[in-house]
Amino acid sequence: MGIIAWIIFGLIAGIIAKLIMPGRDGGGFFLTCILGIVGAVVGGWLATMFGIGGSISGFNLHSFLVAVVGAILVLGVFRLLQRE
């Protein structure tokens, strides 16, 4: 899937990741969107690299779930790094 689609998915996935993992992360909505975009791109890259579920392309449920999982992972890593 193109990078533009991952960015769009990332914006939405970042919001959903924040709803799933609420907390005070600092940076507010802007940081949530950035982490979501990074997470979606990382999730898409990892899913493609490991061949999880075939090809990740287009706007479909599988691609969206990969974006949300990636955003949750990036948010978790961000929180771990923020504690140190």
Curated annotation (Swiss-Prot):
Segments traversing the membrane: 1-21, 27-47, 58-78
Predominant location category: membrane
One cellular component term from this protein's GO annotations in UniProt: plasma membrane
InterPro entries (UniProt xref): Transgly_assoc (IPR007341)
Compartment(s) where it occurs, according to its Swiss-Prot or TrEMBL record: Cell inner membrane
Pfam families with a match to the protein in the record: Transgly_assoc
Domain of life: Bacteria
Protein family membership: Belongs to the UPF0410 family.
Name recorded for this polypeptide: UPF0410 protein YmgE
